[in-house]
């Protein structure tokens, strides 16, 4: 049964018995929640904040993320490419995002600040006003990507082949 939550704060105790899949959350705060391997299939998050949450390996199949902020979260092994692009609006601050995939995504107006993106996949992405401020890209894959709208200010460990990717001239 689909539930709607508005302007609510969730801690781990409130999450333990809640079925997340298929619900809608608007203007909600998830603080210190352990949600690893949870299915968010067909879930809608609008103007929500995840702070110090463990979201490793969550399933985002047909999950809408509009105005969602992730602060100091663990987001390892997530496939963001399963989120519909028309509802995609996210920001990441000081997150661990190892083995995360953005394959083929349109990353428009998305801001990554001080994130650890080791071994993540950015193949086939299109970046429009995408900021990667202070991020670590150790062993990340960039292949057939349009990076002309990407800002890699203060980013480290990225290796981008200009013959396989579109970059600013």
Region roles according to the model:
Residues 1-169:
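Tandem repeat scaffolds
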């Amino acid at each position: 049964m689909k539930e709607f939550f508005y302007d609510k704060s969730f801690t781990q105790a409130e999450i333990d018995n809640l079925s997340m899949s298929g619900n809608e959350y608007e203007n909600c705060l998830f603080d210190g929640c352990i949600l690893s391997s949870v299915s968010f299939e067909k879930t809608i998050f609008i103007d929500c904040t995840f702070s110090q949450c463990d979201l490793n390996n969550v399933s985002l199949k047909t999950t809408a993320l509009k105005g969602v902020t992730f602060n100091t979260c663990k987001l390892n092994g997530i496939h963001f490419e399963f989120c519909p692009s028309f509802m995609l609006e996210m920001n990441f601050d000081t997150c661990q995002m190892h083995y995360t995939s953005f394959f083929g995504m349109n990353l428009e107006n998305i801001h990554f600040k001080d994130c650890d993106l080791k071994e993540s996949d950015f193949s086939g992405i299109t970046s429009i006003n995408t900021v990667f401020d202070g991020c670590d890209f150790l062993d990340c894959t960039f292949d057939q990507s349009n990076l002309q709208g990407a800002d890699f200010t203060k980013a480290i460990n990225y290796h981008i082949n200009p013959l396989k990717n579109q970059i600013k001239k």
